């Protein structure tokens, strides 16, 4: 289930907010109706942290900038991963696809992709893999030639986003390198599922977050075909839930 009290990622966000506005005498109760499965690589902790930051800003009328909200929500991620990181919280706050400076969360840009569907391969093993532990299995460094290649891949990804070049975007997403190679060891039938999805028309495929869930991107209208073809080829429904969705363009918002 969802951790309570100080163990929940909402708590450090509240504490950071309290320090930020320099007003300690505030008391809030946070009730979480979790719509995102826990510990499967979908950014569930980031979703909670982002929603908490946005809700506090609205509740107290503090008028924090988007960059401030991202920095604030990142403190919730610190509790989960051992260090603040802003990729999930920035996208949860802003919607769309967000590229954010890992050293300065107030520096970011946002892109709205068009004509894109996402096929999610959700692990039914809830809470099986934690961000912190899946970071620990990665190497501490990579060689120069690999670094140069990954700079190219990131550049390709960014250009494809800006130009809405879905073919190039899919190619860049599919290039997971050493991170994909290592984390794939912890995902059942990963390479077989990836091959089936790409051969069925997916433009790109990779592990979602720290795993073990996966995702594929497709042109609009192609997602269900990919989903059905992967199901036809492989018996994945015992351990995966498959669904087709799109990228939310609104981000965290007040509902009532």
PLM features: residue spans?
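A short glycine/serine-rich beta->alpha loop
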Residues: 1-4, 34-43, 76-84, 140-144, ...
């Amino acid at each position: 289930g969802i951790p309570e009290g100080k163990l929940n990622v909402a708590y450090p966000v509240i504490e950071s907010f309290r320090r930020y506005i320099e007003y300690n005498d505030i008391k809030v109760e946070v009730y979480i109706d979790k719509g995102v499965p826990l510990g499967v690589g979908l950014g569930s902790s980031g979703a909670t942290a982002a929603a908490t930051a946005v809700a506090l800003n609205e509740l107290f009328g503090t008028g924090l900038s988007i960059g401030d909200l991202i920095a604030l929500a990142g403190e919730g991620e610190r509790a989960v991963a051992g260090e603040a990181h802003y990729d999930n919280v920035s996208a949860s706050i802003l919607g769309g696809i967000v590229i954010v400076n890992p050293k300065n969360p107030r520096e970011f840009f946002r892109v709205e992709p068009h004509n894109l569907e996402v096929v999610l391969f959700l692990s039914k093993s809830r809470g099986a893999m934690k961000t912190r532990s899946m970071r620990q299995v990665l190497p501490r460094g990579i060689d120069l030639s690999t670094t140069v290649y990954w700079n190219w891949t990131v550049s390709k990804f960014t250009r494809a986003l800006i130009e809405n070049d879905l073919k190039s975007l899919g190619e860049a997403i599919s290039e997971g390198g050493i991170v994909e190679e290592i984390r794939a060891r912890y995902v059942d039938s990963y390479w077989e599922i990836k091959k089936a999805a790409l051969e069925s028309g997916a433009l790109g495929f990779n592990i979602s977050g720290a795993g073990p869930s996966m995702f594929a991107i497709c042109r609009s209208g192609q997602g269900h075909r990919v989903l059905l073809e992967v199901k036809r080829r492989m018996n994945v429904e015992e351990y995966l839930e498959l669904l087709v969705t799109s990228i939310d363009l609104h981000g965290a918002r007040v509902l009532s």
